Amino acid sequence: MHINVHTHLFTLRTVLTREAVRAMTQRLADAGVPELLVRALTRFLDQQLDRPELLDEREILARLLHELRQVSGFDRFVQDNLARLPFNVVIRGDGLDQLPLETLRSALDQLTTAMAPEDDVRGRPFDIVATLRLAMKGTITEVADHLLEQLEPEDAIVALMMDIRAEDESDRDRRTFRLQMDGTREAALQRPGRVLPFFAVHPGRPNHFELMKKGIDSGAFIGIKLYPSLGYEVDSPELRRVYAYCLEADVPILLHCSHGGFYRDKAFIDYCDPRNWDSVLKGELAELRVCFAHFGGWDSLGTAGGLDEGTWGGTILELMRERPACYTDLSFHTDQMHDPAAEERYFQTLSRLLEEEKLSRRILWGSDSWLLRMEMTEATFWRYFRERMSEEEFRKIAVRGPRDFLGFPEVEPGEEGRTEPAANLQRHLDFLAQNRSQVGSHPSRWVEELTEVAFEPGREPPDWHRRSAPARAIFALARGFMSGGQRNAGFAQARDLRLKELGYWDPRDPNFEGQTCLGLARELIGACEDHGTYAPGWDRNRAIERLHGVFRRGDKRLVQVAGLLDLIFDFERAMV
């Protein structure tokens, strides 16, 4: 079983705040995404924050192109690049939402190609729409499945929550964080043993300690995630209280430790400096399990002097050698891929470090997906490293090290190390065992072996269950238009029915658009009004207009309609 210790499974719905929009678009700009596209993405994300939706690829492309046309400077850009933009008619015309998918894809590709410097391989965001599609999935479990499907059946991922908040956090932003908590816990139950959650701690959140303690004590979460560049120092009294708890409860900590990523202010990037931990990892706290993610950056391994004394990489290396429980990971190390000399140095250095017995347990495998998707897929990242490392080396970073950091028992019989799970992992095993009849799938083999209980998967998918008001509403409406076979198949099978497969779908009927589809939209919205209130940005007229278009096109599945309704309304139980 390989373990990726660094992934993010949150959806836009469960992470997007005003501060998150600012941090995300700043990261895109820092990564070389063209300015016009960054500004269009900012407008797009602001709209999703004000009135969230579930959009498919065609809808995302149409919205992005529409926002590009509204950005100041775009018309001048078009005039200056007419010869390079054969899709000028598309980007100037109306009716973007009616254009075929391939036309929209080609238009965005041509635009981003023209925007990017010819020598900047990172300037053309080929994968930006794929990233948005992944981030706009309806539930955190769906994001987890997207990553897990690219791995071997027993492989596991550590799901790191994120808390990107501002001091003037709104009630909506607070609810967003709670949804991320709920959705991450749900993913652990849906995919027992394959999704291992870490709770995000931000000391600026008034009840951060109570929320963290509840998550850890319950067994749903096995570690905590810190992101100092979001605006807090690691040696604060608030975090020292967190560290004391982590030491007592035997909880590992993973923190962002590179010059890239998200930051509240550029001055806060230095809050991630590993030298800041010299004053923390003393006395009893010297025993803390701490992973300094990213090894300070890819250049620690890929450039001359990257591990010199005083560098972030050099400091992390010193901590791993001298402290009893310090680790690092290789997440989002991609820049060396574009420079053969840097790539050779990178893997030579990594191989040399892994020859040291202590370091062979301290350097961990991580990808930083889904954020990595801006450049490549999870499978591509894994394949790149496995092709350049020996099987023994990869086993050290993807099996031996992660097991040691997370608290697994010894890797091989007779090998020195734990003989029982660490307390953090044992709590998670107890949590899964207590919910053995309420998991979404059969657990990983290691869970069955360490719990010795019989699991009976009976948990419905988080995006389609009978307790969900929107799922019940669209199913009840659709049932009146189902064939006998569709009705007999039942609730679970109805999940993936497309609207156009139902009996109402007849575009040749002169009353189809103005009467049938509009009537269905009104009926469905009325049914939901009985169980929830309109979410910010939505009202009855907007909701009916949106559903009218959905029924008219007929290409969405029932589960997608339920997901849209879950965004339009605030129900007592959200689908995350």
Residue ranges: model-predicted function:
Residues 6-12, 256, 294:
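Histidine-centered divalent metal-coordination motifs
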Residues 11-14, 165-169, 206-208, 232-234, ...:
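Short catalytic/ligand-binding loop motif for oxyanion handling, primarily in non-cytosolic enzymes
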Residues 14-18, 170-172, 209-212, 265-268, ...:
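Short aromatic-enriched loop/helix-cap "lid" or pocket-rim segments at secondary-structure transitions
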Residues 156, 160-272, 327:
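Active-site gating/metal-coordination segments in enzymes
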Residues 473-516, 520, 529-552:
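Long, low-complexity or tandemly repetitive, helically biased scaffold regions used
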